[in-house]
Amino acid sequence: EDGHWVEISPMSIKREYDFDQVGHKDMYLLHHEEIESLALNIPEARRIRFFMTFGQSYLDHMRCLENVGMLSTSPVDFEGRQIVPIKFLKALLPDPASLGPRTKGKTNIGCIFTGKKAGQDKTYYIYNVCDHQECYREVGSQAISYTTGVPAMCGALMLLTGKWNKPGVYTVEEFDPDPFLEALDQHGLPRSESRTPVLVD
């Protein structure tokens, strides 16, 4: 915010938002890696935030596991061996790929922008709604994997077709977004847009 990193306690800022086709969900302010490159590449941005939704049951389970030490990354002695609790927990949990057939509902992933264009205040919301079961029917995975894989494929397509072509290492926001967004539209992640979204305080 205003050119400075702001640190807060984990999960301490919660907002409720009414997501198109998904409904009212609690979302939490947290760090995500794209914030870092956006802050570097768009220094005139006054504030960049990332919110993600979590259900109360998920949070309760995470707190319980944290309270008993199962989320620790520090090795502990167990029956004469050193184990890392969170790695042990991972070994007990189901393979995420096995959850595809049982995952139901939809994702809503988007960005809300506010700013000025030609001296006029503007607000713009671009988002995608993706159905878990439709994704599973198409590719055998749920929408979380789908909404991760399709943009990566579209980015590769931009490089292979020469639409994105600069020597060096760059992040997505450093290229022309239009052909990338068009590729997303064509390959299963069509966008929706709103000029009057509800803003998040």
Q: Model features per residue range: what roles?
A:
Residues 1-201:
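C-terminal catalytic/substrate-binding lobe primarily of soluble NAD(P)-dependent oxidoreductases
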